[in-house]
């Protein structure tokens, strides 16, 4: 069963098309790695799922509910971490999450639960402005996880972290579907992390979906075309390069 499906989903602006007729199939309970160069359309697609920008063509359903007919109900089922999360620096981590809890109408216990999931319980009283970058990323994840929504949309959750922080966040994300029966859509430029984290991947370039499937399916298809398959990064770069040449574009 797919918890998110798109049908020719498109987002066009006056001078370019950011997302061009893509058909995504995101399985329930999976970690879905969303890949592509800068400007490929990943963030735009995620923002459409969150109601932050409107599609100009096509449609999508989330948990069987069509957008925008069921917009409010859909958004209640999604936790998100888009770009660098903003916090009130003069409030503690706990107080920042309390604001989110009240907006969402969640029980008081949800704040403590979210802090525990991301490992910030012992730092909950510390002011957010005194958090390290890794702790801020964890707080952003806590904000997405609060209330344990069935769908998480995470845009570059390991951005700016050191190797230890990246490993910790990857391990956390990988554990979420099994622990909380949720689905994770995650984008990252760290292809080695997606290779370790994702069950299924989708690759975008210039708004077009080049591939969707498992890593084994990607390697099999790449090998048949003579592309390198030693690791995801080499395969990804070969696919993007071939597509750019086909379109007559250069990255």
Where are each of the predicted segments found?
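Helical segment within the ABC ATPase nucleotide-binding domain
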Residues: 167-180
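Conserved ABC transporter NBD signature motif
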Residues: 58-69, 73-74
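Catalytic Walker B motif of ABC-type/P-loop ATPase nucleotide-binding domains
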Residues: 152-156
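Conserved ABC ATPase "signature" region
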Residues: 98, 102, 108-124
């Amino acid at each position: 069963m797919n918890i998110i499906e798109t049908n020719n989903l498109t987002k066009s602006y006056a001078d370019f098309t950011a997302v061009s007729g893509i058909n995504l199939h995101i399985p329930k309970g999976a970690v879905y790695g969303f890949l592509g160069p800068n400007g490929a359309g990943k963030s735009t697609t995620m923002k459409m799922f969150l109601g932050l920008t409107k599609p100009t063509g096509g449609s999508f359903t989330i948990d069987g509910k069509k957008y925008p007919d069921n917009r409010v109900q859909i958004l209640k089922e999604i936790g998100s971490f888009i770009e660098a999360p903003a916090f009130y620096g003069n409030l503690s981590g706990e107080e920042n999450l309390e604001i989110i809890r009240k907006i969402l109408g969640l029980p008081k216990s949800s704040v403590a639960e979210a802090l525990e999931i991301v490992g910030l319980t012992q730092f909950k009283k510390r002011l957010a402005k005194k958090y390290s970058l890794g702790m801020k990323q964890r707080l952003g994840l806590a904000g997405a996880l609060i209330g344990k929504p069935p769908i998480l949309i995470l845009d570059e959750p390991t951005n700016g972290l050191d190797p230890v922080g990246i490993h910790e966040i990857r391990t956390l994300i990988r554990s979420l579907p099994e622990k909380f029966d949720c689905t994770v859509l995650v984008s990252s430029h760290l292809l080695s992390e997606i290779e370790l984290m994702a069950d299924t991947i989708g690759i975008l370039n210039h708004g077009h979906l080049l591939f969707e499937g498992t890593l084994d399916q990607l390697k099999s298809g790449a090998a048949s075309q003579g592309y390198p398959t030693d690791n995801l990064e080499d395969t990804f770069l070969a696919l993007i390069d071939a597509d750019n040449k086909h379109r007559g574009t250069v990255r």
